[in-house]
């Protein structure tokens, strides 16, 4: 029986076919490596995410200005920025990506349900430094190419890959891939339930072999970061908690300055 992940992938295929990703816009990405930014961050390594809504919460932020949000995230110590470009379920847009790129010099991750090389072309055109690929999307056969081929296609465009998994089997296979960063999504994209223990369970049972592991979804406060870091995560992707804050920069500081505040 199809679940929400199937719906996401089917809608992504339709969005590609409808021409959503056809654009002539071009913005220079700069030589910004998300991998390097996370590994060398002087703060808690956070990828801050720009999005207006989510399937689980609905509207998160109604009238945000992408440039202003990106600048506030940068001022708050973000190592990198993720921009949702998926339009149907996350309220994302290609315009938000382009506007964020023009506003800051941080590495930018294009966050979408990517299954076509055309989406990689757009990521490059709009100034992304990295893209998200979801292991389960390719396991279910939605990719126009196989996962390893899509990673190669991203690398041929000088795009780094954050490869997302949700269970031990997926994570073990992601370790064998050529992905630059490994993501663990605490949200089950089939049922939309969230459990921070997903990261803990996976990293207790699978050796990450020194790779940067980004824990994603469900992070609300500093205690969550401490729990996930103790569990073995090395970086963190946070969206809703930041986008719903009255003061984005202050909220960013709550996350990025954890170690400094404890000294």
Residue ranges: model-predicted function:
Residues 196-206, 229, 244-263:
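C-terminal helical cap(s) of enzyme catalytic domains, especially alpha/beta-barrels
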Residues 45, 57-111, 115-154, 159-162, ...:
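N-terminal active-site wall of soluble small-molecule enzyme domains
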Residues 125-141, 183-192, 233-252:
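Glycine-rich phosphate-binding active-site loops on the catalytic face of alpha/beta enzymes
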Residues 67-80, 127-129, 176-188, 231-234, ...:
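Structural recognition of alpha->loop->beta junctions
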Residues 105-106, 145, 156-159, 209-211, ...:
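Short acidic, glycine/proline-enriched helix-loop-strand junctions
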Residues 51-53, 86, 113, 136, ...:
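Active-site beta-loop-alpha junctions enriched in small/polar residues
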